[in-house]
Swiss-Prot record:
GO terms for cellular component: cytoplasm. Liver, intestine and kidney. The lineage of its organism: Eukaryota, Metazoa, Chordata, Craniata, Vertebrata. It comes from Cavia porcellus. Substrate binds at W72, W77. The gene is STD2. Belongs to the sulfotransferase 1 family. The active site is at H99. Its EC number is 2.8.2.2. It is found in: Cytoplasm. Keywords: Cytoplasm, Lipid metabolism, Steroid metabolism, Transferase. Homodimer. This is 3-beta-hydroxysteroid sulfotransferase. 3'-phosphoadenylyl sulfate binds at residues 44-49, 121, 129, 184, 218-223, 247-249. Sulfotransferase that utilizes 3'-phospho-5'-adenylyl sulfate (PAPS) as sulfonate donor to catalyze the sulfonation of 3-beta-hydroxyl groups of neutral steroids. High preference for C21 steroid (pregnenolone). Its main location: cytoplasm.
Length: 287
């Protein structure tokens, strides 16, 4: 990969919107407050769907907020220059987002009562989604083929580093009462029950009809049509022609892309990297 990206503490980041100074400041000086709600994911794991759901839970299903304020302003990415600047004027209780690996996350979180919702997704689907995303965004070197991107992904040589390390490290927090682990697959399979679980975790009591509205306005159909959530407002200098942020929103798309040899190569490394974890932690292993 070419050096149109930056390295910080062994992790690759885009050059646009990031800096080593800011990443260091976020880790060492960003103050996490007890009342904060933080959505954390590895990229392409359902981040924006999760943000939309949380925003709609907080508004009790009223779509005005999600239809009038861009998603990156409603729940800013704290490690980006834009998001970090926005955080200075965020009113309590705050919600914000991060893709940061655990070792680069704000140190103040670990002594706080802030609530983190961590969403994981089948890394095979993450890989395919990341391939299409990287191919259409001007933030990193474009892979020539899926095979090339798979090589980068398995080496952890992609934006935000290794999926395996990211998930392993964050899952070490899973027994904490202020930490909720969800999966993209569970969200697809039974959205209502997962929304109810998030409500319970956040201490929000919604009426059934309010949950109906959360489900309606966070659906793939509504998000794809909502310019505040579909990233159509991104500046043209960041995207290439044909860019679509919300591409499919399905489970198992990797099966239409991997060859048998690629699937076997991925499985071998996956089994090595994720050995020792109970399979029930990963719903895709039961599919």
């Amino acid at each position: 990969m070419s050096d149109n990206t930056l390295w910080f503490e062994g992790i690759r980041f885009p050059m646009v919107g990031f800096s080593p100074e800011l990443l260091r400041e976020v880790r060492d000086k960003f103050l996490v407050k007890d009342e904060d709600t933080i959505t954390v994911t590895y990229p392409k794991s359902g981040t924006n769907w999760l943000i939309e759901i949380v925003c709609l839970i907080l508004s009790k299903g009223d779509p005005k907020w999600v239809q009038s304020v861009p998603i990156w302003d409603r729940s800013p990415w704290i490690e980006t220059q834009h998001g970090n600047e926005l955080m200075k004027s965020q009113k309590d209780p705050r919600i914000y987002t991060s893709h940061l690996p655990l070792h680069l996350f704000p140190k103040s979180f670990f002594s706080s009562k802030a609530k983190v919702i961590y969403c994981i997704r089948n890394p095979r689907d993450v890989l395919v989604s990341g391939y299409y995303f990287t191919s259409k965004m001007k933030i990193a070197e474009k892979p020539e083929t899926l095979q090339q991107y798979m090589k980068w992904f398995l080496q952890g040589n992609v934006i935000y580093g290794s999926w395996f390390e990211h998930v392993r490290d964050w899952l070490s927090m899973r027994e904490k009462e202020n930490f909720l682990v969800l999966s993209y697959e569970e969200l697809i399979k039974d959205t209502r029950s997962i929304v109810e679980k998030i409500c319970q975790f956040l201490g929000k009591r919604l009426k059934p009809e309010e949950i109906d509205l959360v489900l309606k306005y966070s659906s793939f159909k509504f998000m794809k049509e909502n310019e505040m959530s579909n990233y159509s407002l991104l500046p043209n200098d960041l995207t290439t022609e044909g860019f679509t942020f919300l591409r499919k929103g399905v489970v198992g798309d990797w099966k239409h892309h991997f060859t048998v040899a690629q699937a076997e190569e991925f499985d071998k490394i996956y089994q090595e990297k994720m050995a020792g974890y109970p399979p029930k932690l990963f719903p895709w292993e039961e599919c």
